[in-house]
């Protein structure tokens, strides 16, 4: 965010504040050009136009996901929780996963809509998926792939081909029987991969935003590393939010805002009481 460069945290530290929970929230990026999300991203509109294409949300759905070893590594239904997904992907080789679906699933998303809408939208239908993905690839998006065979897909992505084909065969059997014995994904999200072209998009961990920095107590008073109160100094919001470590609680939407709102109220009230208190 323009203008937010850590001045408040640095001033508090210079005043003797302890440091606590200084971290970046772990989040996931799926089906987007990760190179466009590195460096100066202050112009969010420009970044979004470069990183995302209209078909990006199709790679944020609960379809088959594998790592570079060609293995599934989590229940794809949990992709809806960016924290769970990012933590799982971060443990894989090269910290990357691949969501894969075929032409039949693409038609489903075009005609009936996505399983999960990933943003505020008036429709969940995604038109012209094949054309949009091919255009993104032609424009230089190195995180999306189109292939006419699984061998070709493996060659493009670097996934181990034999393992990928074995996983797809096992997954297709689960789709046919309606029973996922590996991760017990619900039948509604079991869709086979048999009809080319095959589409893949990378899933990578990324930083959602900074958290923590200033150590406070339950009265929002700033304290030193030894928990000694610094009189008259209060802090609130994300600069003092150390309740998540590196994993935001996506199952409780708005909780960062809730902490900011209420810690700000508490800090304001306590600072007012401090100013009004008799000297000495």
Please annotate each region the language model reported:
Residues 71-118, 229-245:
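Gly/Pro-rich active-site capping loops and adjacent beta-alpha segments
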Residues 91-198, 270, 274:
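Helix-rich C-terminal "cap"/substrate-channel and partner-interaction subdomain
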Residues 149, 163-247:
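A glycine-rich dinucleotide-binding beta-alpha-beta segment and adjacent secondary-structure elements
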Residues 1-36, 251, 257-266:
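Glycine-rich loop(s) and the adjacent beta-strand/alpha-helix scaffold that form part
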Residues 27-32, 78, 82-85, 205-211, ...:
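Glycine-rich phosphate/pyrophosphate-binding beta-alpha loops
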Residues 41-88:
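Phosphate/diphosphate-binding loops
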Residues 223-224, 228-278:
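Catalytic phosphate/nucleotide-handling subdomain of diverse soluble enzymes
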């Amino acid at each position: 965010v323009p203008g937010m460069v850590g001045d408040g945290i640095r001033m508090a530290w210079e005043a003797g504040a302890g440091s606590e929970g200084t971290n970046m929230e772990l989040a996931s990026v799926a089906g987007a050009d990760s190179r466009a999300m590195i460096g100066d991203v202050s112009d969010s509109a420009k970044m979004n136009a470069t990183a995302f294409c209209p078909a990006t949300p199709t790679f944020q759905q609960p379809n088959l996901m594998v790592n570079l070893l060609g293995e599934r590594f989590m229940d794809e239904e949990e992709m809806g929780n960016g924290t769970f997904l990012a933590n799982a992907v971060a443990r894989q080789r090269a910290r990357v996963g691949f969501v894969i679906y075929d032409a039949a699933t693409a038609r489903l998303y075009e005609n009936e809509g996505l399983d999960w809408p990933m943003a505020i939208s008036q429709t969940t239908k995604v038109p012209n998926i094949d054309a949009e993905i091919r255009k993104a690839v032609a424009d230089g998006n190195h995180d999306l792939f189109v292939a006419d065979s699984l061998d070709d897909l493996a060659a493009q992505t670097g996934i181990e081909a034999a393992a990928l084909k074995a996983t797809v065969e096992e997954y297709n059997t689960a789709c046919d029987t309606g029973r996922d014995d590996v991760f017990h994904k619900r039948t509604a999200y079991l869709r086979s991969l048999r009809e080319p072209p095959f589409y893949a998009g990378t899933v990578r961990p990324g930083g959602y935003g900074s958290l923590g920095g200033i150590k406070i107590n339950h009265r929002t008073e700033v304290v030193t590393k030894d928990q000694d109160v610094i009189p008259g100094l209060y802090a609130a919001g994300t600069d003092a939010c150390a309740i998540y470590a590196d994993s935001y609680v996506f199952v409780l939407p708005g909780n960062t805002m809730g902490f900011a709102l209420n810690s700000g109220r508490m800090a304001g009230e306590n600072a007012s009481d401090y100013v009004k208190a008799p000297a000495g």
